[in-house]
């Protein structure tokens, strides 16, 4: 329509001016319209460029900006084309005729609005994403100082723990050193104490001999003590042997298990007889040889006996008492270490519960004297002491020596021998809780073999 109108007006002008051959000069209105049209085009281009610049500044790396191009629609009109990012086109036709300036400005404003709307739609999604990213960055910025502070606290705590660990390690090393020193001091003290006790025992024995051991006993002793003397040859009455010496005298010469019938134990019991050591006739009441039997037991087991007579065993306190109260007995102790070294200890007098009306209530006290042998004396210290087990404490120590040294014995405070201790197979780190005979191998060596056996003192000895 605009073009038709333009053509019509041009035709009219030509009809009116046909008689005139002289060309007319452009009017002021026409110049003004041309200037305004140029300004409008420049304004549109400037606005579009500014928006595109802002779009590139705030959303780098997004879709390419709209492309604005201009051109002539006809000889008397201009065409502005905007190509959007989605390949759609926006065309604006600009009419330079002065009579329609209002419409031209309206179209210009509409074009500007269209351009702005297109740019807004183009930037909407990236800006939304940018806002979310900015919000996330703000949140992270707020949390970062807290995380750094917590990391610093954890690092401080870690350093403190490392320092504490180092202090504990130093303390533990010091305690271990102190423990070793105390063990050494205890071992030395135990040795000094053993020598002191042995010396005192020797002095007391000498004093007793000086005062005369053959003096009559007081009335109480005579009432309590059974008659004990040397054994005559052969069995006392009948054919029942009272111990292994009677078995030997009856003609049996082989080691083995035999039945004996002590004077105060007429029901009798079986024992192992050693028929070879120093003439034979020995009744065995204790043997350790391989660790197959547990010797860390309570009172009832040690009273009644346990184990195998042909292997490791303990005959029982009540049976040892029955044997040693019917005559005067001597004790022989055989020992062997794990290097096949051997030694022995002999005691000319031995008895269990000799002066007791109720030996179990009295704790089966030990009587032993007159040492000789190659192993050294480790038993005289225990003479006069009651038997102690882990569940019946009769020693002179503040602690239960049986529980502490893992055995059962006539402990005093605590021991110089512990033949019923743990079978530890030679040298051991623990202190005095093995099969010990301290005068021969010390307190930290557990023997391979021990055997305790008794025999009556005969007239010809």
Swiss-Prot record:
Binding site for Ca(2+): 393, 395
Disulfide-bond pairs as recorded: 244-273, 401-414
Mutagenesis / variant outcome for changing residue 431 to S: Significantly reduced binding to acetylated bovine serum albumin and loss of binding to chitin
Glycosylation sites: 340
Protein name, UniProt field: Fibrinogen C domain-containing protein 1
Residues in compartment: Extracellular: 55-461
Annotated compartments: Membrane
Organism the protein comes from: Homo sapiens (Human)
Main location: membrane
Disordered as annotated region, ranges: 1-24, 214-238
Compositionally skewed regions (Basic and acidic residues) per UniProt: 15-24
